[in-house]
Amino acid sequence: MQFKITEKIKNLEIDDIKENLLHYSYDSKTLKALVKKNTSKDEVSYITAYSSFVGEIYENVIYELLLKYTLEKDEIKSFVLKGPYQAKENHFIKSGLLIDRSSQIVYKSAYKDISEFDALFFTEDSLYFVEMSTSKKTASLNKRLAKKYALLKIIFPSLEIKALIVLTKGSTGIKNFPSYATVWLTEDLSDDNLIEKIIFAKKVKNDLQTLKAPENKKFIEAYSIKYKKFPYFPTLEWILNICRKHPKFEVDLKFFSSPKMSLYFDIYTKLYIG
């Protein structure tokens, strides 16, 4: 099925979640310093820092709106908590699907970050990963989807993997997204008072649960999810060993043409066989 955007999300109606946004951790150090120096808003350094900061807030806005959206949609069976909603048990998980130090949903293998997800939710037979961006150019985002899709396909082999992409109006390249992706378009985040308030808000510690999700069994913790482990480095070693076992050729090219290997190629962006 394809989830449809609501008017509330499309128009970024956030009056009821503004206080919640102050509970998230932000990297405001650079922007705060520029504001204190009265740096011109036309300076490249200011524009870059401001755009990045607004992108952080936008991600949290959409996440908050998706929490409410989840309660409205019977098709959504579970939604992964992160940020100020996560339980302290998540901090003891060091590998696999977890919440990292910056309160993001990531997959780690031997302390290596494989992929990061802005949000994850499950339906009866599918897993949706959510990506949010305020950049009007979507080429790099589109390119990153393949790795995320491949990883989730490996660790959740029985589920159909889909993506929900949330962008702002005026974004380009929307028709270039893969068929498994649903694209939502919202208004730009332009609440200057809110943005300024968050810039100078007291820094929040990532390891504290300061908000409580609504009492609903749909909301789940990352540490409770069952999935198939993906050992990043042992798998890489296995690929390198198997591809050399052809009786006639130094490299078995046919081995690389299997469907499973196509998923691995999306995860291992560079593979050198010397």
Model features per residue range: what roles?
Residues 1-274:
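Intrinsically disordered, low-complexity Ser/Thr/Pro/Gly-rich regulatory segments
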